[in-house]
Amino acid sequence: MAKKVANIVKLQIPAGKATPAPPVGPALGQAGINIMGFTKDFNARTADQAGLLIPVVITVYEDRSFDFVTKTPPASVLLKKAAGVEHGSGEPNTNKVATVTSAQVKEIAETKMQDLNAADVEAAMRMIEGTARSMGFVVEG
């Protein structure tokens, strides 16, 4: 018989840097999860992705055990890394802050493909291009 799901917790945590401090600790404590167990597992699983923000979906069961699934980093984080900027534009229609090439967009789309609701890479590229434009980036090519 399958375990009954008690709660689902969604967080975005820097890769390899989960700690019991806020915001991770309180969110997991409310769900009744062993915080140290989660942080060790998460940090081990994401050690190779240092510097990126990793979304994680934690499924908590009634017996207080848990499973978690890490997703790919948000498109905005990958775009900022590709463009080499700290943050997007506050006025994306008038103030362009960076440029990304279509090759960079394709690479990001291929990385994000498993988490996007897209039929093929071209559709995923259009989604990533839209995100880039809304951040004040110019897409070349």
UniProtKB/Swiss-Prot annotation:
Name any Gene Ontology BP term.
translation
Q: What keywords does the record list, in alphabetical order?
A: Methylation, Ribonucleoprotein, Ribosomal protein, RNA-binding, rRNA-binding
Can you name one GO molecular function term for this protein? large ribosomal subunit rRNA binding
The PTM entry states: One or more lysine residues are methylated.
The record ties this protein, via SMART domains, to: RL11
SUPFAM superfamilies assigned: Ribosomal L11/L12e N-terminal domain, Ribosomal protein L11, C-terminal domain
Tree of life domain: Bacteria
This protein's GO cellular component annotations are: cytosolic large ribosomal subunit
Q: Which InterPro entries match?
A: Ribosomal_uL11, Ribosomal_uL11_bac-typ, Ribosomal_uL11_C, Ribosomal_uL11_C_sf, Ribosomal_uL11_CS, Ribosomal_uL11_N, Ribosomal_uL11_N_sf
**To which protein family does this belong?**
Belongs to the universal ribosomal protein uL11 family.
How does this polypeptide assemble, per the annotation? Part of the ribosomal stalk of the 50S ribosomal subunit. Interacts with L10 and the large rRNA to form the base of the stalk. L10 forms an elongated spine to which L12 dimers bind in a sequential fashion forming a multimeric L10(L12)X complex.
Function per UniProt: Forms part of the ribosomal stalk which helps the ribosome interact with GTP-bound translation factors.
Q: Mind telling me what this protein is named?
A: Large ribosomal subunit protein uL11
